[in-house]
Amino acid sequence: FIGYNAFGSLVLGRPENGVLQPAARICTFLVSMAMVGVAEEFIFRSVIAQTLLEHFGTSRAGVWKACLLSGVLFGAAHLTNILSSAPFGVLMQCVFAASLGTLFAAIYFRTGNLWVTVFLHGAMDISSMLIGGLYGTTTVADAVSGYDASMLLSVLLYLIPTAVLLRKKKLPEVQLYWHQYVKK
């Protein structure tokens, strides 16, 4: 998905006769987008998802509940964009973010490594706003306002790998790592 975003941005979204932003602005864009990934992953995976896992336990149902609920909360957090973007676009972003948040929780639970999701999140944010950051042509509010019903495909794109990561055969990996933190 990161490659798809970057390809789409660079090949399909490049403005005709576009002028690159100054290097300082491009660097600011890259750091800003990366830091969104850092902040959101620490809040939603390291604090919220882990707390939910501690509450629900490491049974198969507990892990799934923690992943799904943390994903829904992550999606709901994007409702704040209603202040600057079109309502339907924000709704689509919330659905997209909820399914992505569920996948990121599964990755975090399987690897026990928050930096994996921090990197993926930052790379997705950068790749999705690449043209706006390089050429100054699109704001986050504009991008969100442009989201349409095709974003619903993300539910499948992210929940299928979530199911693969949390399949019954691999659940012992989650339990092995997290037993030291979860008492249930």
Can you annotate each of these PLM segments?
Residues 1-7, 71-80, 122-132:
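Aromatic-anchored segments of alpha-helical transmembrane domains
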Residues 10-19, 32-33, 80-88, 141:
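Membrane-interface helix caps and helix-loop-helix hairpins in membrane proteins
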Residues 16-26, 56-61:
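Helix-boundary and loop/linker segments of multi-pass membrane transporters
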Residues 26-27, 64-69, 91-95, 115-119, ...:
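Hydrophobic alpha-helical transmembrane segments
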Residues 38-43, 47-48, 52, 76, ...:
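Active-site His/Glu-centered metal-binding helix of metallohydrolases
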Residues 39-69, 106-113:
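Membrane-interface helix/loop boundary segments of multi-pass membrane proteins
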Residues 89-147:
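Functionally important transmembrane alpha-helices
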Residues 122-184:
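C-terminal membrane module of polytopic membrane proteins
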